[in-house]
Amino acid sequence: MPTMKILTEGELRQIVPLDLDAVKCTEDAFRALAVPNAVKMPPILRLDVPDSRGEVDVKTAYIPGLGGFAIKISPGFFDNPKIGLPSTNGMMVLLSSQTGLVQALLLDNGYLTDVRTAAAGAVAAKHLSQQDASVATIFGAGVQARLQLRALTLVRPIRQARIWARDQLKAEALVEQLKLEHSFAISASDDPRQAVSGAHIVVTTTPADRPILVASWLEAGQHVTAMGSDAEHKNELDPAAIARADVYVADSLTQTRRLGELHHAIEAGLIARDAAFPELGEVIAGVKTGRTRESDITIADLTGTGVQDTAIATLAFQRAEERSAGSLFES
């Protein structure tokens, strides 16, 4: 009978921390996207449940060379906190690329998505920010804000961080958390423009539906990673920022034209709908250029891709096998 491995969130937290291995597997996944006609990644399936302020995204991708591929179900029900439940959860199923049989059921409640999303921020900063970037500004005060800062420390010599959020109390609470994790200076800002001034890297991690980062605030040499715009209605960057940037890079141009910050610049008439831009995987692979000057303003528009899910699920399964983690289930 077919046997699968079942891993809980607690087990996955122990074996898949946000570390350099998570960054590398994410980087390799993006690089695979640069190989013509190799990766198979269908469009994101999205189901809206408006009566409950809910949405469900399903992502998947097949990457040649990996033994399995993941299918991720990622719900977000944003009224849940009112009844004492988390707003997001989810799970991944890893299937064999050879037989299609289920290899693992990863009951991560969104944890692996958090890790791979933060790892993507590290990959973007590694390939697009100044190599000596040391001052980071994070917009947002949730889990991803905390993880994005940790991810940046894996690839850049961060020595100072600023946190801005629309809820100042949440920003201050996050700063107190972060001070326990990092030894460098971390402060909460009550002015987003001041938070951006002098920063080398700016990461936006919010579900905003109107711009929170204004184009005129951007300074020469800065890198911006926009993480939050993974649906048509979400928008963190002033559309003019895309037009102003010296370098704009998408995780998937097909997706960012429909979901990301690029989508809003197109709708505003600032960017042609068929304008060509490099994808992050192409920059990693060296087939397209990213930053070429220290003074370049660079923007990475990350909407989240199925290759990231397959990559992190594969890493989780490998580590579970190595450490005999999880439970075996015969179907």
UniProtKB/Swiss-Prot annotation:
Keyword Lyase: yes
EC number(s) on file: 4.3.1.-
Coiled coil: none
GO molecular function, one term: lyase activity
Sorted UniProt keywords: Lyase, NAD, Plasmid
Pfam families per UniProt: OCD_Mu_crystall
GO cellular component: cytoplasm
Record's keyword annotation contains Membrane: no
InterPro entries, per database record: Ectoine_EutC, NAD(P)-bd_dom_sf, ODC_Mu_crystall, ODC_N
NCBIfam families: ectoine_eutC (TIGR02992), PRK08291.1 (NF006141)
UniProt record similarity statement: Belongs to the ornithine cyclodeaminase/mu-crystallin family.
Protein name, as recorded: Uncharacterized cyclodeaminase y4tK
